[in-house]
Swiss-Prot record:
Gene expressing this chain: Skint6
Residue ranges that the UniProt entry lists as topological domain Extracellular: 25-1086, 1147-1167, 1227-1240
Tissues in which the protein is found: Expressed in skin.
Residue stretches making up the Ig-like V-type domain: 26-141
Domain Ig-like C1-type: 142-231
Pfam families, per database record: C2-set_3 (PF22705), V-set (PF07686)
Protein known as: Selection and upkeep of intraepithelial T-cells protein 6
Superkingdom of origin organism: Eukaryota
Record keywords: Disulfide bond, Glycoprotein, Immunoglobulin domain, Membrane, Repeat, Signal, Transmembrane, Transmembrane helix
GO cellular component term of the entry, any: membrane
Cysteines paired by S-S bonds: 49-123, 163-217
Cytoplasmic face of the membrane: 1108-1125, 1189-1205
Described purpose of this protein according to its UniProt entry: May act by engaging a cell surface molecule on immature T-cells in the embryonic thymus.
Listed transmembrane segments: 1087-1107, 1126-1146, 1168-1188, 1206-1226
Lineage of the species this protein comes from: Eukaryota, Metazoa, Chordata, Craniata, Vertebrata
Length: 1240
């Protein structure tokens, strides 16, 4: 059972690819930083922008520019940084960070920012024709805190102050203000800029005597709105009066009533806003010294404190006065020389002020600060501190105290706990207050948050020693585990722990205590499930939080692992922890390293023998839910690595593997599976195939599964594409062993051969084959295997014609692609050659392949080298005697349409003609093949649609063949025959014949041509000249070439002799002799004999008819005689003389066309007149014969003889001139019927 686990799961892993959904990102938006972005002058600027939705941007154009599109700050295109296109002022000052370009995110970095770098920056993405941009506003700024006020020596009128500050950008706003914050006009202002573009500001103020006692210099940056200021206080003088007031209070001789009046006066001064603050400060110093003095009686002190309290509580008293009052209280409390009764009076006043709702919050804050400083002071005795803490505790727990006051109280407690200057005993007292407040029912709910803040900040603070932190954690732990504490309180206590764990400022040791607390609480059997739920939630949030450091997360994950694997932990707790794992894996916010640890927990739990089967079952169910979830993110790829390692691991038992298979099966069948999950799963499939640890049997099962997937009609096309992508990657990978590739290619072959598989799927598969063969990164051995499969597919009878057509289409595209390696093309062409050489290959397949070859050769986009390779293969096919003659015929039939097309490149035609030459010169080539090739050559030269330049190239090759001594004589004779037939054909273009005669002339002039070849060529010339069917114009052209050859000195004597013999042997032919020797003789001299015979025959026949008619008392009609009998005789004569035919035609119709028109009409008569005349006149005579009733007359006998003669002549003509008769019948028309005027 252990060995079956891998194949079963591999099968399931591949089936999972059925749920893949192809993603396409045709459009996008660009997001980036919010404007404005502030950057310090001279610093470095980073501007980021991101494609939404995230997608690959390597292939896109990424352009950063400021004002003009054509002036880029940075340009990235086609995967390259185009530094030469950058504007000169940004050269070597910018760089593009492309770490996340796969997600569509880039960052522009500008070094040493200057003032000109301010402005709008455009982040521009362009994909093909679609583009988007995001604009970011950048503002360069600089702020300085270095402000100085210089006082010049005073004079009789006043004093001059000078405020100076440097290091600002842009130019800031600068002004003077008085103590009340009101604007004072400056005497003068000035500014300057240094070499770094920073502004240096200077401002003067002249203060007259007794006008202002203080002034402040304010500077504000317009961009950041940041303010900096410095104050200057002029020295005061009125001190004597204050000294007198102090002596009154110290004197025991002054009665209490007077002191009371004085205090009221002081109080009114304190509460008055018109009194100079300096005077108030002096008064307060007097009061403070009296309170602290032991010589002052208790009643006086009470009066003093009462006046202070009323001033503090009075809302009309300004804040500065109150601050001074409270400072005096604070120093009195902290003064060890002050007696306890006085301190107690002070604290009572403080408490009543804190609890008084009419006292403003600012005053209470100052009071609480005084309490805090007193608690923290080591000079304050423990009894005083206890009294202070009682005030705090009673105030916190009191419902009458405002919540804001309690907040400040607790903040003071917090600062005291965190202070290193506070002794441990004081801190323990403070912690007791916190604990009693947490566990107390009388504390209102708002205080819980305040207490949590104290605990949180105290635990996080590095200033708090570990002992106090441990005490705080214990307080929280005991409160959480206490049944008397309500659930809401426990909830916020757990939140405290969570925030402490997430804090980056928290030291590791404290976090260890917190994590141990979580572990003990989760694994505790006495803990209620509600509390555990909150604890688990916090563990989850800490794991998923990006603020928690990795080490803390690792500790939390160890808790989860130990809890899952611990048999004593409740099942419900384990379920909650597994949910945490599931949600964390699925979460986008969780980093990959955390997920990796989570999955290691899963892996160790699955592989662990100590974990019970129930826990494993729950764990695997969660894996199934993750796989089937539509919210899985790319980080989940780690899960598939775990599945893969578990399948390959020998430590995983069979039962666990079976469960893994059971949870994977419904995942494959689920329609809600996310496309990312599908892609990850099929990547895992690829890794399994590529892995050397997976045995061949498992790979075979995986490939079988692939085959079945692609054959199913219900499989989504997008998912098929993803599967095919992986097949392509496997075949392209050099790490995959050849056996795996071989198995995979067999499955591909089976798919293509299967007629039940949809044609679209086959097309997708063939598209991948196409890409693999085009790729230069694919190994030659892989390509050879693939091409072997292609060969067997085309060779197979069971493969559908459409599939073969698609495959051949892909082959054509590969051969046409200039980026494909030439070696790959050579391999492909070898396959083509082998296919065509097989006699068992279906004829339809061969035809399809030959069509593709024709298209490749005709295509202008195919490289010359590729065509050369292809033609070499064709040549070797034609040379092979084993190849079926029908296939060779097909190949040769390609030549004509290629040469015929004007769109085919001339270079391609030249290459093809080179091969024709080689074929005809080859001694190993079968004669039958050569015959068929020569037929093709003949057709090409006869074809008027073939370009003249192409024919010229062909005739060049014929010339070279005839001149070549290595060419067999039989081949040359065949070629000569074709030349003969071309020259004889009347429909062959004259220009073509002229080209051919040029070549004949060159051949006969050449000394390298064999004598035997020349003899054969001369015999052809002789036969042409002696032929009666050959047109005189052709003979003229031929004789013209002979004349040039005989005149040439370069022609051998033997050749000339041969030609002269031909001319002499052709001399008996009257037509040739007369045409060549006496070109200027008139027409009647050339045809005198024919004309004489014709006239004599007409006279004889006319006399006989005249005598016959006289005997029969008939009226003689010359027109009737001409139209019946004479025309018959003329018809016989016309049959033997071409010129006479033309003469009769032109004379009868009274028309003699000039020039070429005459020539064309003569050619027309030559072709069609003979059979037409005889057919027409035979029909006329036959009708006449049937109309004659007197059978005894000579006329009847004459007509009978004429009918027989006409019929015999017509029969002979039909036998020897079948082709002309057929042509005449096809071209029968009115003009031909009217050659002679026939009358009844």
């Amino acid at each position: 059972m252990g060995t079956i686990g891998v194949p079963l799961t591999a099968h399931c892993v591949v089936l999972f690819l059925l749920q893949m959904v192809a993603l396409s990102t045709e459009q996008f938006t660009v997001n980036g930083l919010e404007s404005p972005v502030l950057v310090p002058l001279g610093g470095n600027l980073e501007l980021s922008c991101q494609l939404s939705p995230p997608q690959q941007a390597k292939h896109m154009e990424i352009r950063w520019f400021k004002n003009r599109y054509s002036e880029p700050v940075y340009l990235y295109r086609n995967g390259k940084d185009l530094n030469e296109a950058i504007v000169y002022k940004y050269v070597e000052r910018t760089e593009l960070l492309k770490d996340d370009i796969g997600k569509g995110k880039v960052t522009l970095r500008i070094f040493k920012v200057t003032s000109v770098d301010s402005g709008s920056y455009h982040c521009f993405f362009k994909d093909d024709k679609f583009y988007e941009e995001h604009i970011i506003e950048v503002k360069v700024t600089a702020t300085s805190s270095d402000i100085q006020i210089l006082m010049h020596p005073p004079n009789s009128t006043g004093v001059r102050l000078e405020c100076h500050s440097g290091g600002w950008f842009p130019q800031p706003h600068m002004e003077w203000r008085d103590s009340k914050g009101e604007y004072i006009p400056a005497t003068s202002k000035s500014h300057s800029q240094d070499e770094n573009e920073f502004f240096n500001m200077t401002m003067d103020l002249f203060i007259k005597s007794n006008s202002y006692w203080s002034a402040a210099c304010y500077i504000q940056n317009f961009v950041t709105h940041q303010e900096e200021s410095i104050s200057f206080v002029l020295p005061g003088t009125k001190v004597l009066l204050l000294k007198n007031i102090q002596s009154i209070f110290q004197s025991s001789s002054v009665d209490l009533e007077k002191k009371d009046m004085l205090l009221k006066s002081i109080k009114s001064r304190f509460q008055s806003s018109s009194v100079d603050p300096e005077k108030k400060e002096r008064l307060l110093k007097i009061i403070q010294s009296r309170i602290e003095s032991s010589s002052v009686d208790q009643e006086t002190k009470a009066l003093l404190l009462e006046s202070i309290q009323s001033s503090i509580e009075n809302s009309t008293v300004d804040l500065e006065t109150k601050v001074w009052l409270l400072e005096s209280i604070k120093s009195s409390i902290q003064n060890s020389s002050v007696d306890p009764e006085t301190k107690e009076l002070l604290l009572e006043r403080i408490k009543s002020s804190i609890e008084n709702s009419t006292v403003d919050l600012g005053t209470k804050e100052w009071l609480l600060e005084s309490i805090q400083s007193s608690i923290q002071s080591s000079s304050v005795d423990l009894g005083t501190k206890k009294m202070l803490l009682k005030i705090i505790q009673s105030s916190i727990q009191s419902f009458s105290v405002y919540i804001g006051t309690k907040e400040w109280l607790l903040e003071r407690v917090q600062s005291s706990i965190q202070s290193s200057s506070v002794d441990l005993g004081t801190k323990e007292l403070l912690l007791e207050i916190i604990q009693s407040s947490i566990e107390g029912y009388s504390v209102e709910l708002g205080i819980e948050e305040l207490l949590s803040k104290i605990i949180l900040s105290s635990i996080q603070s590095s200033r708090v020693d570990l002992g106090i932190k441990e005490l705080l954690v214990k307080i929280c732990q005991s409160s959480i585990q206490s049944t008397s504490v309500i659930l809401e309180t426990k909830e916020w206590l757990v939140k405290i722990f969570q925030s402490n764990i997430q804090s980056s400022s928290m030291d590791l040791e404290t976090k260890v205590w917190l994590v141990k607390f979580f572990q003990s609480s989760i694994q505790s059997s006495s803990m209620d499930l509600g509390t555990i739920k909150w604890l688990v939630k916090n563990v989850q949030s800490n794991i998923q939080s990006s603020r928690v450091d990795l080490e803390t997360k690792r500790m939390l994950l160890e808790i989860i692992q130990s809890s899952i694997q611990n048999s004593s932990v409740h099942r419900g707790t384990k379920k909650m922890l597994l949910k945490v794992i599931q949600s964390s894996i699925q979460s986008f916010s969780v980093d990959l390293e955390t997920k990796e640890w989570l999955l290691k927990i899963i892996q160790s739990s699955i592989q662990s023998s100590s974990v019970d089967i129930g826990t494993k079952s729950m764990l695997l169910k969660k894996i199934g839910l993750i796989l089937r979830s539509s919210i899985v993110n790319p980080g989940t790829e780690l899960l598939f690595q775990i599945i893969q390692s578990d399948l390959q691991s020998s430590s995983v038992n069979t039962e666990t593997r079976e469960m893994l298979f059971e949870i994977t099966q419904p995942t494959v069948q689920s329609s809600s599976v996310n496309s990312v999950t599908e892609e990850l799963l099929e990547e895992n499939y690829q890794l399994l195939l590529q892995s050397s640890s997976v045995n061949l049997e498992a790979e075979n099962i995986l490939n079988d599964t692939t085959q079945r997937i692609l054959q199913l009609s219900s499989v989504n096309q997008g998912r098929e594409k993803l599967l095919l992508d992986r097949i392509q990657q496997i075949l392209q990978s050099s790490s995959v062993n050849p056996e795996t590739k071989c198995w995979l290619l067999k499955r591909i072959q089976f798919i293509l051969e299967n007629p039940s598989v949809h044609q679209e799927k086959k097309d997708l598969l063939l598209e991948r084959i196409h890409l693999i063969l085009q790729s230069s990164s694919v190994q030659k051995e892989t390509k050879s295997l693939l091409l072997g499969s292609i060969q067997s597919i085309l060779h197979s009878f069971s493969v559908q014609k459409e599939t073969k057509y698609l495959l051949l289409e892909k082959i054509q595209l590969i051969l046409q692609n200039s980026s494909v390696h030439q070696e790959t093309k050579d391999l492909l062409l070898k396959i083509i050659q082998l296919i065509l050489q097989y006699s068992s290959v279906h004829e339809a397949t061969s035809k399809l392949l030959l069509e593709r070859i024709q298209l490749i050769l005709q295509s202008s986009s195919v490289q010359k080298e590729t065509k050369d390779l292809l033609l070499n293969r064709i040549f070797s096919i034609l040379q092979n005697s084993c190849v079926d003659q029908g296939v060779k015929y097909f190949l040769l039939n390609i030549i004509h349409p290629i040469l015929q097309k004007t769109s085919v490149h001339q270079e391609t035609k030249s290459m093809l003609l080179d091969r024709i030459e080689l074929i005809l010169q080859s001694s190993s080539m079968q004669q039958e093949t050569k015959n068929h090739l020569l037929d093709q050559i003949e057709q090409i030269l006869q074809d008027t649609t073939v370009h003249q330049e192409t024919k010229d190239l062909l005739l060049n090759r014929i010339e070279l063949i005839l001149q070549n001594s290595s060419v067999q004589q039989e081949t040359k004779e065949l070629l000569m025959d074709k030349i003969d037939s071309i020259l004889r054909y009347t429909w062959v273009h004259q220009e073509t014949k002229d080209l051919l005669l040029n070549r004949i002339e060159l051949i006969l002039q050449s000394s390298s041509v064999q004598e035997e070849t020349k003899n054969f060529l001369c015999n052809i010339i002789a036969s042409i000249l002696q032929s009666t069917s050959m047109h005189q114009e052709k003979k003229k052209l031929l004789l013209g070439r002979i004349e040039l050859i005989l005149q040439s000195s370069s022609v051998q004597q033997e050749t000339k002799k041969l030609l002269l013999k031909i001319v002499q042997s052709s001399s008996p032919s009257s037509s040739v002799r007369l045409e060549s020797c006496n070109k200027r003789n008139p027409f009647w001299k050339k045809h005198a004999l024919d004309l004489g015979i014709s006239v004599f025959a007409i006279i004889v026949v006319t006399l006989i008819r005249h005598l016959n008619q006289r005997e029969a008392d008939q009226h003689f009609e010359l027109d009737t005689l001409w139209s019946k009998d004479t025309s018959v005789i003329l018809c016989v004569l016309i049959m033997f003389n071409n010129r006479l035919k033309a003469l009769i035609y032109f004379r009868l119709y009274g028309y003699s066309p000039p020039g070429k028109t005459y020539k064309y009409i003569v050619n027309y008569i030559l072709r069609f007149s003979q059979p037409l005349f005889f057919i027409v006149y035979s029909a006329i005579i036959l009708v006449m014969h049937l109309q004659i009733q007197n059978t005894d007359s000579l006329f009847s006998l004459y007509n009978s003889w004429m009918v027989e003669m006409i019929m015999v002549l017509g029969l002979l003509l039909a036998i020897f001139n079948v082709k002309n008769i057929a042509t005449a019948l096809l071209h029968l028309g009115r003009t031909t019927l009217r050659l002679f005027r026939i009358k009844d």
